[in-house]
């Protein structure tokens, strides 16, 4: 390589920002924070850099909050005095327990049906080896709480030490609601207990609703149907309801942000006006990665990115360098190999689907890939970097 050749590819930077409060001009804060970071740290902004903003500060600036009483009011309006089957929730104090508190406050009785041995994102309620040993078929077997305890005893999550069966039972009862707990993986199993169902799964919710309706359920709603409009002046989310919400206080939740496209466009324009660079902008939540140790799929939000500028539509269109080096140009080396690979990249087609030289690349949505990178960069704790700047993502070996 020549001494003046570029040596760095994609770079992801966490950008520190002020603490965001309701009513803050978030577009101005984000644009200013990124531009000032570039000036202070000595890097340049470029066309097609990606500015990513975590959904949390978007919702905070919007004041998109609701209380458990708001949740209860909507549940009561939709289910009346019926026994409510609450099925397939994830096991999370931050994500679901606070919602369950509101749901229970709006119902007289809940039949809580938990999927096993794991919830949708991989939190366990039973050990897989024990499932095999006990001869249990999770696909077909419906377990009562008593049978579950007989087979598996008290099962606590590895990282939190929480027995979610007991924890969710207490949440419901403390809200003044009667509860029965069963374990099953077939949505139709709930109809043996009630025909009024609130399905709480995230990514499989459309199929679950269809199955329940086809099986004769009288009332079917999902978490995405609760708080799609304000209750008593609360926040709401027209598209996702309670999905993507987080615990804010012991009595309230922060909802997934709404109407984010205008924010993305505003940030894009502010940066263009001040720097002359046309950047891409997206709002991101959970990354779409899975933890190989804890077996947890991180994506508890309904989508990785609820809004983004148009330049982030689509999937990568890349060649696999090692495939080219090991196959097409296996007899070349040094500068000749570099030139041959560079020529292939420059001349590649606009759609490489089915091309052997593209095998092993990542055919996922750009926003899912970049959002996952940003979630890992910003973290979920005290880093103080709710904005992430990704540079060089759309470059390749020839740039």
Feature map (PLM): residue ranges:
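Conserved mixed alpha/beta catalytic, RNA-binding, or beta-rich assembly cores of soluble enzyme
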Residues: 2-47, 56-399
């Amino acid at each position: 390589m020549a001494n003046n050749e570029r040596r760095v590819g994609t770079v992801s930077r966490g950008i520190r920002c002020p603490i965001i409060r309701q009513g803050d001009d978030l577009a101005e804060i984000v644009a200013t924070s990124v531009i000032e970071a570039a000036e202070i740290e000595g890097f340049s902004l470029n066309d097609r850099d990606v500015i990513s903003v975590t959904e949390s500060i978007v919702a905070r600036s919007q004041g998109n909050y609701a209380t458990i009483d708001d949740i209860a009011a909507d549940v009561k309006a939709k289910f009346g005095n019926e026994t409510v089957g609450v099925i397939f929730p994830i096991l999370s104090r931050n994500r679901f327990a606070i919602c369950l508190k509101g749901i229970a406050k709006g119902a007289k009785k809940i039949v809580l049906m938990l999927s096993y041995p794991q919830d949708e994102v991989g939190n366990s309620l039973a050990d897989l080896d024990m499932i095999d040993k006990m001869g249990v078929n999770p696909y077909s077997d419906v377990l009562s709480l008593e049978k579950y305890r007989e087979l598996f005893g008290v099962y606590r999550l590895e990282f939190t030490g929480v027995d979610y069966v007991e924890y969710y039972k207490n949440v419901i009862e403390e809200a003044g609601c009667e509860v029965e707990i069963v374990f099953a993986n077939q949505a139709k199993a709930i109809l043996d207990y009630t025909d009024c169902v609130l399905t709480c799964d995230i990514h499989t919710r459309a199929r679950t609703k269809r199955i329940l309706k086809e099986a004769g359920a009288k009332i079917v709603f999902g978490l995405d149907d609760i708080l799609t409009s304000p209750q008593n002046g609360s926040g709401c989310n027209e598209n996702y309801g309670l999905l993507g919400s987080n615990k804010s206080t012991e009595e309230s939740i922060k909802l997934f942000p709404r109407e984010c496209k205008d924010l993305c466009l505003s940030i894009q324009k502010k940066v263009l006006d001040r720097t002359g660079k046309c950047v891409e902008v997206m709002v991101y939540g959970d990354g779409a990665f899975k933890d190989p140790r804890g077996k947890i799929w991180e994506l508890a939000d309904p989508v990785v990115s609820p809004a983004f500028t148009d330049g982030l539509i689509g999937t990568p269109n890349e060649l696999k360098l090692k495939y080219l080096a090991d196959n097409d140009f296996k007899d070349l080396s040094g500068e000749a190999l570099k030139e041959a690979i560079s020529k292939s990249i420059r001349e590649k087609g606009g759609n490489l689907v089915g091309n052997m030289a593209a095998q092993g690349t990542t055919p996922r949505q750009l926003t899912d890939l970049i959002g996952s990178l940003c979630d890992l960069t910003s973290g979920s704790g005290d880093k103080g970097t709710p904005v992430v700047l990704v540079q060089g993502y759309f470059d390749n070996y020839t740039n």
